[in-house]
Amino acid sequence: GEIDWFFNPTEHTSHDNEWTWSLYRHIYWQPLARAYALTKDEKYTKEFLHEMTEWGRAWPVTPFMENEEDAAAKYKFPGHSWRTIETAMRIYTVWLPCMEAFRTSPVWDREGWVTFLTLLCDHADFLMTHYSNHKKSSNWLTMESGTLLECGILFPEIKSDWFMTGYRRVMQEVKYSFDNDGIHMERTPIYHMVAAGVYFQCYRLCKLNDIPVPPYMEPTLEKSAQFIMSLVKPDLSTPMIGDADRDDLTTRRCDTSLYEGMNLTFDPYDLNEMRAYFRTWYEETGREDFRFMATAGKQGTPPAQRNYKYIPAGIYVMRTGWGPEDSYFHVHGIQLERGEVSSHSHNDTGHVEIHAKGEDILTDSGRYIYNSSCWKDWRHYFLSAKAHNTLYVDDHEMGTVPGVTRTRGVRTYLHAFEENEQYQLIDISHNGYDFMDDPMFHRRRVVRLPDDVYVIEDRVTGICREDHDIRLYYNFAFGHLDGENGKFDYTSQKGRGYTMTVQADKKLDFEILEGSEDPIGGWISYGYAWRKPIPQLIAKHSGKAPIHFITVLAPAGIRAEAAINGDAATVTLADGKVLTLTENAVELH
């Protein structure tokens, strides 16, 4: 039957506009183009032309060009086709690749070309007069400007200002949107890759057409690829920092979202967009570490560097190596550039993720759903400290500044980032709870010791006048967790056993949730609109700060006994050595 271009199956469940917006991104035309390239069967061309024509009839641009606000008001649900993000995204990820795949088809006749080019002009002209310019999340303007530049380069016969407008915007934004470490201002892997992919596509198109680019463009974009590479875990997946999914270099497709997926670019050789991204960078630079990523470790050489500290972004990564049985942990205190909206950042400062011997142990819970749906309580949960491995206080949104909306003022101070023969250490503090009525301060140290023993120390201080709901949350990867009274046993997906002990210098209560809907707790989302139960441990204290926590995670049978004595926290190991953490020192002797 014919496609209903106004259909949304979530009307009576999540009531989520993202489903319809995904429909308007036309990503399902990519398989038609691939099938035609392989078979030259004209039924695929006919279907592409038919769907394009019918979509154009269903969604003319004129009402949105004349008065976007009034036109959009008619489609609060299920959403409309002419948001600038969809307008831009479908052109560079689908329409232009489909043009390349189908353009020699004898079925694509003059009428089809008139329809295609008319609609393409509608898109580019609409983007000329509708520029989000950081009023929305910055990935919107990335796609808008990239699409204008690509249309300007590929269609010089069409008299327009597309090229110069897109060119100016892209060359300015590629530096404005990425810091000197090559990290995108939204600080989350999939939106980073969206922006990096658009600008890399623009860079390559400029090079192929002898169009000058600024001297900072190529090194900035190469660093953006290095950043994603530095986050990759030993199992070749990426961490779910902020609104990110679990993307995997080893699978047929890297993205598991049911809809609202990554939508990076179109690659003719590989459905896994992340592998394709690194392969293209390998072709561009000849770097063997990019080849290592592009082939999921089968060829090339792993990166020479193991540990990475990104102070401006607030992301810190340590690992034992790049092999499948290596271990990895990261701590983050995401710092958004001043003025950047917080759309895709979570309330998770101090979050620690632990990946031991090639599998996740402590994990980020992912993103699951956006506020475009009616499931606001689920969105709030996945944004909150509860869905991360960090300190929770009174459900306060970290970094909230009174009178300022959609901006996170969290800043992290890095006290130490150190590796020696005895341990690896990441030590941070932050201002996330400063604007509470009774301000509180949080310092976290994460120490990795031999035998994959991890020590997490949390010091919570402040004026300490009021009682608070103070909690530590630990979200475990798929597996089994049980225990009580501060000692818990966890069995991982690979059947490995671990023991976690949690202590404090004040009374603690404990709770384990797994797949709970009331209260919401113990869930993970590897992709948008997808969730599964996981074990979640909560250590709770009701009362005043200060409070001093010490958490130890160790493989089963490995001795690691913790204690708190005054200012010092100690962990006694099997060989008799003692790790001592005081306010100003970390020592193992």
Give the predicted meaning of each segment.
Residues 2-9, 15-232, 237:
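Aromatic-lined, polymer-binding surfaces characteristic
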Residues 18, 23-25, 313-315, 349-351, ...:
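Extracellular structured ligand-interaction cores
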Residues 362-365, 369-373:
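Cytochrome P450 core scaffold surrounding the K-helix E-X-X-R motif
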Residues 1, 8-10, 130, 319-321, ...:
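Structured loops at beta-to-helix junctions and adjacent beta-edge loops in soluble globular domains
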Residues 183-362, 417-421, 543, 548, ...:
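Carbohydrate-active enzyme catalytic cores, enriched for enzymes
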Residues 88, 244, 268, 275, ...:
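CBM-like, beta-strand-rich accessory domains located in the C-terminal region of large
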Residues 148, 228, 318, 458, ...:
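A residue-level signal for conserved active-site and pocket-lining positions in enzyme catalytic cores
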